[in-house]
């Protein structure tokens, strides 16, 4: 009986504890990211932002959560009730599942699988289903139009994102995210320089992937009221909101892992190794999240045809050319990894 416990049940308990250890801090980070966004944008616009609830407004996310929790959930009369309720749950759960393969520090990862990149791409592609289901189930033209926009936008930028990731795989020779980070420890500086433009393209693509300004066409307030979540209230609206911000943190972690060295110190400076890798990971993710907020505060929304043109006529040819360029340079210099 004891052998059975240690062989089958104990590993499941450890996995459950790891999931809780990642999920609870992540939800807290998502809650306080909304607070940080309002404060940062407020300061950029010479306003105070939320500063009443608690010291410096730090209890504002808790007040917002309590308010949304006690709101009445309203389901439209002609909506598909089951799908209407399921859609925000799908979006939120998928935004959390992606964290399973992200390495926070050396050896600190929930599932260190050898196909981590494919797993991340699969999860990010599935997240659009929650939005499409919400738009269709709401039985509203605004919600449906927002859902169609979101699916078209995601398809357009998933292609260039995939090609950018191929350039990373060519230089590191692995699909394991922990090994990708470790490969950057010994990577020559000129390869880092060659990947830098792709890092910029990847970051712009994930802005479109997460429906953030200047690519927030699926929920354009001035055109579609609120897009795919126009009919949602209470916790349904809150789950969409949490899912969007959790995705922001996830794609920032992906960008950090692929292009900024993950948990490694900046520029591989050896004397900075004394600082824990988790600190560097959080610092880099925090910087990218600040860029998200900065872009939202300063840039206007793209027109929809401009958004599509950027994805198909600029990013797709550029990333295709860069894949050929990187592979040619690696073969010529004999730096192609032995897989």
From Swiss-Prot:
Its main location: membrane. Keywords: Cell inner membrane, Cell membrane, Membrane, NAD, Quinone, Translocase, Transmembrane, Transmembrane helix, Ubiquinone. It comes from the Bacteria. The keyword Hydrolase does not apply. It is found in: Cell inner membrane. Its EC number is 7.1.1.-. InterPro entries: NADH_UbQ_OxRdtase_su1/FPO, NADH_UbQ_OxRdtase_su1_CS. GO terms for biological process: aerobic respiration. It catalyses: a quinone + NADH + 5 H(+)(in) = a quinol + NAD(+) + 4 H(+)(out). Pfam families: NADHdh. Coiled coil: none annotated. It is a multi-pass membrane protein. The chain crosses the membrane at residues 9-29, 82-102, 115-135, 161-181, 187-207, 235-255, 275-295, 311-331. GO terms for cellular component: plasma membrane. One of its GO terms (molecular function) is NADH dehydrogenase activity. It is an enzyme of class 7 (translocase). NDH-1 is composed of 14 different subunits. Subunits NuoA, H, J, K, L, M, N constitute the membrane sector of the complex. Belongs to the complex I subunit 1 family. NDH-1 shuttles electrons from NADH, via FMN and iron-sulfur (Fe-S) centers, to quinones in the respiratory chain. The immediate electron acceptor for the enzyme in this species is believed to be ubiquinone. Couples the redox reaction to proton translocation (for every two electrons transferred, four hydrogen ions are translocated across the cytoplasmic membrane), and thus conserves the redox energy in a proton gradient. This subunit may bind ubiquinone. This is NADH-quinone oxidoreductase subunit H. It comes from Rickettsia bellii (strain OSU 85-389).
């Amino acid at each position: 009986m004891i052998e059975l416990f240690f062989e089958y049940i104990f590993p499941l308990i450890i996995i459950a504890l790891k999931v809780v250890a990642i999920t609870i801090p992540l939800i807290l980070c998502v809650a306080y990211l909304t607070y940080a966004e309002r404060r940062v944008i407020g300061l950029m616009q010479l306003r105070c932002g939320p500063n009443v609830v608690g010291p410096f407004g730090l209890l504002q996310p808790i007040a917002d959560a309590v308010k949304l929790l006690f709101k009445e959930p309203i389901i439209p009369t002609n909506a598909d009730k089951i799908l209407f309720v399921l859609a925000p749950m799908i979006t939120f759960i998928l935004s959390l599942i992606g964290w399973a393969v992200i390495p926070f520090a050396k050896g600190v990862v929930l599932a260190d699988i050898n196909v981590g990149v494919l797993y991340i791409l699969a999860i990010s592609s599935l997240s659009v289903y929650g939005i499409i289901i919400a738009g269709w189930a709401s039985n509203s033209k605004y919600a449906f139009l927002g859902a169609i926009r979101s699916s078209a936008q995601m398809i357009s930028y998933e292609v260039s994102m995939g090609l950018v990731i191929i350039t990373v795989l060519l230089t590191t020779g692995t699909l394991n995210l922990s090994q990708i980070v470790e490969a950057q420890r010994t990577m020559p500086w000129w390869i880092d320089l060659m990947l830098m433009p792709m890092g910029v393209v990847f970051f712009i693509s994930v802005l479109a992937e997460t429906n953030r300004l200047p690519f927030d066409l699926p929920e354009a307030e001035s055109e579609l009221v609120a897009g795919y979540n126009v009919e949602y209230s209470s916790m349904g609206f809150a789950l969409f909101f949490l899912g969007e911000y959790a995705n922001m943190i996830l794609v920032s972690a992906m960008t950090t892992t692929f292009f900024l060295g993950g948990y490694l110190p900046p520029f591989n400076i050896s004397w900075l190794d004394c600082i824990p890798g988790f600190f560097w990971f959080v610092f880099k993710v925090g910087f990218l999240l600040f860029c998200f907020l900065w872009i939202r505060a300063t840039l206007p929304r793209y027109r929809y045809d401009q958004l599509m043109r950027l994805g198909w006529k600029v990013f797709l040819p550029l990333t295709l050319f860069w894949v050929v360029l990187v592979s040619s340079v690696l073969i010529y210099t004999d730096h192609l990894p032995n897989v």
